[in-house]
């Protein structure tokens, strides 16, 4: 593995079914007092060549050779995808985020010649902010990362600390935080969750698609099924309505929309742990309606509390010593982040999101600098369970998959030509870098 290191200034201590947020207040008077800073000016265009530039966190790591799958002690992998939080919004000012949070003086132009600095959220429930395809393009601004305030207002610049997120911050003592995990696409929920299932969004860039069984191309469940790897999707907080979980991405695929394993619930998860029957691969889908997925304006302590319960149940089970639990977020939700994402194709990568790797084999008190996106979780499953890549089985991508207008997403359209899965791209790590084995 070859690493390119980049020393940066130290940080300061301290859908269709869910409409996008309206414009938020943009004045300091509306949200309290803020410190004025000097704007950090972006230099040059941020294009495909930026993949080779050391712009990410404290270090940028490349995987040169995918190589054959190797034996690992992991027998169970749990993947939980929460909603709408950025890395800097949750951990940018954490004392352990040295070199991965905003550098001293980082701020945002206010659109009137001044600047506005990030500030601490004192409320656990705050308004939703813009995270549509168009809004995120403006926030990203070609890699300048200077459009959060002018696009979404003062609410986009709030951050939390360990006082508001005690369970999450406590994880650092024992486990690994990913410092360069990006969502897959510069856009909202559904296309990012498609990457988590399929390694591609099929060209879709908006939440303007919905329906059970509308897709029929291969996803990770097909690979697991073909290899005889047990799996289940646990819908946490959606116990009463069959097929009614609006955050369960797997119901979009014909083969799995009504499969009973796609519709497990919280009770199933707890019972499976008590009986030592946790499947080899488990996906956790917390309820959006109850705010358990942390999607604004939900109280962040509620979703965090659910995560603490789920993680604790795993740690107290007989399978813990052979397990890993990953907590990630589908996209950044419009909240600020200072790191320009690698621009690897017309769709992304997207903005950085917080991601924990919780396992007896996770590197303790460690921030991993390898570049990841949601496809990296698929690469981990492929590595641990010796699966083929989705790119290898999906080379004849179904171009009839509904994608809206067939324009280039890179040129600002709401959709683009279907793109192949990313799980053979060497620029994306497979998350084994987070473990001690």
Model-derived regions: residue spans:
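N-terminal pro-sequences and low-complexity stem/linker regions of secreted or lumenal proteins
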Residues: 2-8, 12-18, 22-437
């Amino acid at each position: 593995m070859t690493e390119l290191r980049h020393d940066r200034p130290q940080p300061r201590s301290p859908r269709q079914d869910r409409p996008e947020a309206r414009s938020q207040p943009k004045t300091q008077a509306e949200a309290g007092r803020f410190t004025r800073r000097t704007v950090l000016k972006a230099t040059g265009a941020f294009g495909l060549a930026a993949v080779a530039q050391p712009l990410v966190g404290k270090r940028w790591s490349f995987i040169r050779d995918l190589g054959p799958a190797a034996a690992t002690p992991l027998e169970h992998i749990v993947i939980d995808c929460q909603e709408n939080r950025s890395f800097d919004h949750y951990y940018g000012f954490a004392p352990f985020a040295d070199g991965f949070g905003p550098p001293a003086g980082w701020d945002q132009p206010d659109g009137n010649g001044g600047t506005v600095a990030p500030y601490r959220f004192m409320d656990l429930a705050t308004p939703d902010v813009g995270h549509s395809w168009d809004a995120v393009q403006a926030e990203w601004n070609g890699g300048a990362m200077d459009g959060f305030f002018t696009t979404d207002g003062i609410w986009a610049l709030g951050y939390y600390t360990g006082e508001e997120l005690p369970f999450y911050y406590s994880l650092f003592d024992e486990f690994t935080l990913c410092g360069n995990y990006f969502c897959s696409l510069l856009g909202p929920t559904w296309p990012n969750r498609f990457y988590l299932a399929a390694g591609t969004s099929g060209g879709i860039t908006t939440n303007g698609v919905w329906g059970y069984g509308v897709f029929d191309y291969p996803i990770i469940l097909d690979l697991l099924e073909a290899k005889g790897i047990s799996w289940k999707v646990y819908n946490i907080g959606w116990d009463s309505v069959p097929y009614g979980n609006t955050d369960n991405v797997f119901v979009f695929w014909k083969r799995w929309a009504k499969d009973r394993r796609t519709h497990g619930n919280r009770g199933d998860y707890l019972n499976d742990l008590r009986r030592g029957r946790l499947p080899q691969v488990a996906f956790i889908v917390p309820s959006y309606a109850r705010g358990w997925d942390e999607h604004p304006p939900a109280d962040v302590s509620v979703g965090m509390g659910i995560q603490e319960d789920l993680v604790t149940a795993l740690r107290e089970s007989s399978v813990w010593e052979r397990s890993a639990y990953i907590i990630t977020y589908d996209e950044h939700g419009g909240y600020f982040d200072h790191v320009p994402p690698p621009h690897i194709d017309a769709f992304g990568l997207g903005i950085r999101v917080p991601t924990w790797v919780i396992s007896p084999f996770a590197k303790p008190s460690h921030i991993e600098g390898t570049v990841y996106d949601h496809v990296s979780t698929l690469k981990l499953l492929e590595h641990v369970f010796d699966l083929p890549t989705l790119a290898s089985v999906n080379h004849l991508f179904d171009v009839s998959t509904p994608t809206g207008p067939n324009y280039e997403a890179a040129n600002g359209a709401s959709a683009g030509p279907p793109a192949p899965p990313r799980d053979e791209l060497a620029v994306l790590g497979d998350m084994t870098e987070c473990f001690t084995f």
